[in-house]
Amino acid sequence: IAAANILLVNGLDSSAPTHKWLSMYQSIAHKGNSLKCKDMSIMPGNTCPTKKDEFWLIEMVAKTIESNVYIFSETKNKTASRPTVKKLTILTSGLTPSALTKAKQAAKTGYAIGEGVNTAKYLGDLPANHCTPKIIEKKVKAMTKDFPKLKIKSFNEQQMQKMGMGSFLSVSRGSEEPARMMVIEYKGGKANEKPIALVG
């Protein structure tokens, strides 16, 4: 086998709770970073948690690895650790052509969720002076280049005052930078589907 490192992990049986599966792949991701892996191939096998299928497993592996190789280093010194894993390959066997297509989509979905988790981590890890309302707004608006279905509406203090958002504005009154509020809409579902709203 042409691999610099081979990691053998004691697997789980189908009765193991979901958090045990997540913890196992989190450990694999962290080990990949510590070994400074650039390419990582994982063979999850055919055993899945009870009431889950192989597509759930593939999505979970992609999501968990992507979101756990993340290391924040932007404002740290040059010697700080940085993530090294650039490529993940999930190895499967015995899939029909249609199942393989579904498996690839599951991997893409997992990777996308992992990227979203990493974006939230990144914004949360930024120091306050690197994460002001204007900076966050700029970063979010930049995402519309990659996601054309993403729509951003911004409101300044005067507009929020007219909407009666006094409680919101009272929180930011002592800040040096004026408050901003964004409404972010992603309309990727069907027109008759109920929307999902997150407030925070």
Which residues does each predicted region cover?
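Short amphipathic alpha-helical segment within the helicase RecA-like ATPase core
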Residues: 1-199
